[in-house]
Every structure is written in structure tokens, then in C-alpha cells.
């Protein structure tokens, strides 16, 4: 149980894929996220970078409605990084 050199001490694992959807408007950001999730295996993690405003309000909610798990959301500058676990 060593946490030396562990700046990110979560047990979520590394994302299998990351999508940078800054500048992509609704609903296209959700569609791109959904298509990427469909190409992934159950339990894999997807990181999505979204703009503030409509994207960060709508995409995580739509993802939850699809049955996936929003593990974490974190602000990165003017955007947000959302970590999603595929159902």
C-alpha cells in the first residue's frame, strides 16, 4: 500500500480513450461521446473534455440516461474533463 509518487491516488484506472470536444456544439458532442462509448468494451473508461455551459450541463446527464457512469468531473481551465465508465 505505497502511495509514494502517487499524485493521482484514485483507483479509477487510466482512460482507454480521451476525446477533446471543446468547440463542438450540442448535440454533436453527445453524439461523438456516444459513438466512442459504443466502440469500447464494458467497464472501460472514457475521458471527455467539454466546454462550460450547455455541454457540461447536457452531456453528463445524457450519458447517465444511457446507463453509463459519470465517475468524475473536474475543471481544467475554461473546460471540464469528464471521466465516464461504459456500462
Predicted feature descriptions by range:
Residues 2-32:
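N-terminal first-folded block
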Residues 16, 43-47, 79-81:
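Intrinsic-disorder/low-complexity, polar/charged segments enriched in Ser/Thr/Lys/Arg/Asp/Glu/Gln
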Residues 21-73:
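Amphipathic, hydrophobic secondary-structure cores in small proteins
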Residues 81-87:
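Core SAM-dependent methyltransferase catalytic element
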Amino acid at each position: 500500500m505505497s502511495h509514494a509518487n502517487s499524485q493521482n491516488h484514485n483507483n479509477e484506472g487510466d482512460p482507454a480513450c480521451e476525446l477533446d470536444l471543446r468547440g463542438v456544439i450540442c448535440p454533436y458532442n453527445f453524439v461523438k461521446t456516444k459513438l466512442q462509448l459504443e466502440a469500447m468494451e464494458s467497464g472501460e473508461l472514457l475521458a471527455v473534455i467539454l466546454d462550460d455551459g450547455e455541454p457540461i450541463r447536457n452531456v453528463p446527464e445524457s450519458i447517465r440516461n444511457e446507463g453509463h457512469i459519470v465517475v468524475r468531473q473536474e475543471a481544467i481551465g475554461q473546460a471540464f474533463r469528464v471521466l465516464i465508465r461504459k456500462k
